[in-house]
Amino acid sequence: MIFSDWPWRHWRQVRGETIALRLNDEQLNWRELCARVDELASGFAVQGVVEGSGVMLRAWNTPQTLLAWLALLQCGARVLPVNPQLPQPLLEELLPNLTLQFALVPDGENTFPALTSLHIQLVEGAHAATWQPTRLCSMTLTSGSTGLPKAAVHTYQAHLASAQGVLSLIPFGDHDDWLLSLPLFHVSGQGIMWRWLYAGARMTVRDKQPLEQMLAGCTHASLVPTQLWRLLVNRSSVSLKAVLLGGAAIPVELTEQAREQGIRCFCGYGLTEFASTVCAKEADGLADVGSPLPGREVKIVNNEVWLRAASMAEGYWRNGQLVSLVNDEGWYATRDRGEMHNGKLTIVGRLDNLFFSGGEGIQPEEVERVIAAHPAVLQVFIVPVADKEFGHRPVAVMEYDHESVDLSEWVKDKLARFQQPVRWLTLPPELKNGGIKISRQALKEWVQRQQ
């Protein structure tokens, strides 16, 4: 699909009276959606937003956030979505390098005096910049799990290439409906939005409420395994046909239970820099993350995964300049340890996470996969702690779905002795920050405080 106009305007021409969006209890067809976006875009234009303006959008997923995002894009703006939970000092360090002029904070106040505050206002008109697929449109902060986040900058065509690749694997028809279940300040949330726009299907955006209620009428969702477990265990009445799972090891029991209820489960491997998913497959309990999707290339160099793709970011934004992602050979070196077998990629773990205990290398992700296979485990992280005799020893930080269980016996015949955690700690609520990734650095610091 090649668009010659804004995707929502394209679908207005093709199927204007078909439902495009469900916003809480309101339904908008493509014609009504375009009218709403036109008024919002005209409102932003009156406030000074022009092509190339940098706008920070600090908001949770709400119907208003989604419509504002589309309107800012239609103005030709470069949107930086920000997690409202990010601390002020971090943003004060980050924002000056990102060449922003405006801040839109729909449910709060702008705490950055250097940025002009934008307000949601509807103005009669149909303001729109010219559709240019190669225009820079989004700046997405990387997870920052090992340092200060960077802003990866994507074009429209990169986001659409990402969507096209995923939808070559996951059927998403005209009358299917994908819940915007992940935050738009993460690239995985943006991926849902762009798949909806690419397919011309339906999307649902609801204010925060129990997942089962949010899923009412939805055929597709992007979830973490914990969420799907809870839906299945509670025998929730859902209309799901397909789920894209991410964020953790995926037990085969989970996908088999889902299949029995008519839900196909997909999983894969993605990065902020590549506008979400790079490799994917229908979940089968095997360790690989699937084959590269169309438009993506993968190769292994010295055990490291290298990538290039049509969905790749143009670069990292720094003081008005784009800093290239690629190395001298034109590839993005991920710092992920990986292996390719029969065209399928297996991620062993982060090169940066490898540590040594008594001379033996421990890759945390390998140990985590073994422990995560226990049915009581929702999440597990292996953290190195300094040890005078061994250099480092592994500590497990756990989230369980019920009362804590003793896993130290369970792992004895499944992990080498040096891999077995010397302590088992429960993941504290303060580290579950509403993001998709939990910072390993924050975990290390917390574990050190427990010593």
Curated annotation (Swiss-Prot):
Catalyzed reactions per annotation: 2-succinylbenzoate + ATP + CoA = 2-succinylbenzoyl-CoA + AMP + diphosphate
Gene Ontology biological process terms from the UniProt entry: menaquinone biosynthetic process
Claim: Ligase is one of the keywords in the record: yes
EC numbers: 6.2.1.26
One Pfam family of this chain: AMP-binding
Pathway, per record: Quinol/quinone metabolism; 1,4-dihydroxy-2-naphthoate biosynthesis; 1,4-dihydroxy-2-naphthoate from chorismate: step 5/7; Quinol/quinone metabolism; menaquinone biosynthesis
Organism domain of life: Bacteria
Gene Ontology CC: protein-containing complex
InterPro entries in UniProt: AMP-bd_C, AMP-bd_C_sf, AMP-binding_CS, AMP-dep_synth/lig_dom, ANL_N_sf, ATP-dep_AMP-bd_enzyme, MenE
Record's keyword terms, sorted: ATP-binding, Ligase, Menaquinone biosynthesis, Nucleotide-binding
Enzyme class, broadest EC rank: ligase
Single GO MF annotation: identical protein binding
Gene3D superfamilies cross-referenced by the UniProt entry: 3.30.300.30, N-terminal domain of ligase-like
Homology family: Belongs to the ATP-dependent AMP-binding enzyme family. MenE subfamily.
Its job: Converts 2-succinylbenzoate (OSB) to 2-succinylbenzoyl-CoA (OSB-CoA).
Protein name per the record: 2-succinylbenzoate--CoA ligase
Species of provenance: Escherichia coli (strain K12)
Gene symbol of the encoding locus: menE
